[in-house]
Every structure is written in structure tokens, then in C-alpha cells.
């Protein structure tokens, strides 16, 4: 709110706020459907039939859990949250969290499939390509069998932890990097196209673009 308050519309204009509708869930569905993962086609069909489809509500209905819990789990998995943090966000104990996740993955299997696939690719190739072809690199390494050690460049990690005792770091964030990177591609591309038409955004906030809009009282 403080940063937004710095910006005001141009003279004789009003403030216009435009954002994507569930940009990141749609990207998850897009990538899962490209792989023909089980369950993704249901969401594709729903988006094609009704562009106001609420991803979180669909997951809520499928997994038979409240929408708030569905949204928390969705975003937690998209952003690479660990089980401990997800438990805290849900406000439940470990057993309940594990039951919720098990039910979620059984009824919405494509999210976990996509998460595991992106982790594997990041580990094998060292990068993922976003929807516009930018590379999200995973070029740091950590011990393969120890948690909490500092991630280092390859040569440093080999010296510190042993040449054959390391793995790529941060791969659990692979889905997050793919989805947020692709969302950034879409938003920046939209900003570029709009600027070519003479519409310059005053500020970008995540998936939102804010403009001065002619105050047409008619």
C-alpha cells in the first residue's frame, strides 16, 4: 500500500487496475495438459467452457476440502513449500496435514506429477525453460545426503563436500521457477505490447498492471 500510494493518475484521468485471472494456476494446468497428466483435461475443459473458472474451488470440490485449504495447498505446492511450512499455513498437526495432502494428490494427481517432473528436469539438465524460452538455471550444488548445508558453485561444492557426494540445489523450487518465470514472461510481454500502442503502465504488482485511464464521464 505504501509503494502504491506514491503513484497517482495523470491529470484528468482515473486509476485503472488490470490483472490476470488466476495466472499461475492456469499455467500449471497448461503444462500438465501438455504432458497429458491425469486430471488436467478436466480443468482445461472447464476453462474453455467458462473463463471465470475458479481453480481453487474446483480443487476444493474434487478433494472434498474447504476452498481455503485447497488454495493454501495449491499455492504451497506451486511455491515449493516444505511440509513443515505447509502445516503451519494450514494450522493443523502433521498427521492431519499428511492426510490432506494424500487426499489432494489422489484426486488432483497432475500437480504432484508436474512438480516431480520439473524437479527431475532441473536436476538432470540444470535449467528449465519458461513459456517464452528464458532459462531458469540451477547452477549451485549441495550435499546429496545432508540437509542444511550451504549451496555452492560446482567446483567449490566438489572441494567442500566431495566430488561424488553432491546434487543440484534448489530443485524442489523447480515448479515455482517455471510457473513464476512464465507468469513474468506473460506480464512483461503484455507491458511491451501495450507500450507499443502508447499505453505505459505506471506500476506492476505481481500479475497486476496499473494505468492512467481517460476519465470519460459520458
Describe every region a protein language model picked out.
Residues 1-218:
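Conserved catalytic core of nucleotide polymerization and phosphodiester-bond processing enzymes
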Amino acid at each position: 500500500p505504501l509503494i502504491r500510494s506514491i503513484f497517482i493518475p495523470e491529470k484528468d484521468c482515473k486509476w485503472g487496475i488490470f490483472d490476470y485471472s488466476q495466472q499461475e494456476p492456469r499455467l500449471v494446468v497448461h503444462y500438465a495438459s501438455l504432458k497429458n497428466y491425469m486430471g488436467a483435461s478436466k480443468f482445461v475443459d472447464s476453462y474453455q467452457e467458462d473463463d471465470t473458472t475458479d481453480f481453487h474451488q474446483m480443487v476444493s470440490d474434487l478433494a472434498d476440502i474447504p476452498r481455503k485449504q485447497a488454495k493454501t495447498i495449491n499455492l504451497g505446492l506451486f511455491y515449493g513449500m516444505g511440509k513443515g511450512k505447509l502445516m503451519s499455513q494450514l494450522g493443523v498437526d502433521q498427521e492431519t496435514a499428511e492426510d490432506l495432502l494424500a487426499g489432494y494428490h489422489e484426486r488432483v494427481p497432475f500437480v504432484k506429477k508436474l512438480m516431480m517432473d520439473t524437479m527431475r528436469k532441473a536436476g538432470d539438465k540444470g535449467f528449465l525453460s519458461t513459456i517464452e524460452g528464458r532459462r531458469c538455471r540451477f547452477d549451485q550444488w549441495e550435499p546429496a545426503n545432508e540437509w542444511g548445508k550451504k549451496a555452492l558453485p560446482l567446483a567449490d561444492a566438489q572441494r567442500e563436500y566431495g566430488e561424488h557426494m553432491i546434487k543440484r540445489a534448489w530443485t524442489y523450487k523447480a515448479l515455482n521457477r517455471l510457473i513464476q518465470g512464465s507468469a513474468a514472461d506473460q506480464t512483461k510481454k503484455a507491458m511491451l505490447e501495450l507500450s507499443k500502442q502508447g499505453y505505459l503502465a505506471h506500476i506492476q504488482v505481481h500479475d497486476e498492471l496499473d494505468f492512467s485511464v481517460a476519465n470519460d464521464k459520458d
